């Protein structure tokens, strides 16, 4: 499936969500189930991506074993500070109980592991649409 999608979307990036195999599977499952339509990264991490993600970009989402689970397309990007995250954008990420409090706790832990967390840190928030799901 990954090879098929790489041929169909030759400019697509292949990657997995999160920073662990368990998180990669959990978040990919939320995307496939239609619950996750947004994600964010620290601006520091975003600036290291080559080429950078832009609206219209295609992505092949992988699970923890590197198998392709779906193709998504970036619809919009916005710059937002961690402490300015809205409840609506937090819920769009589809994680936990969908609350802003859950989002703050989970993402603070993630960004602390990354070594970039502060309440004022800048995030790149991405909204995306699912185009195809693996059978």
What kind of region is each of these model predictions?
Residues 1-71, 77-135:
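Mixed-charge, low-complexity intrinsically disordered regions
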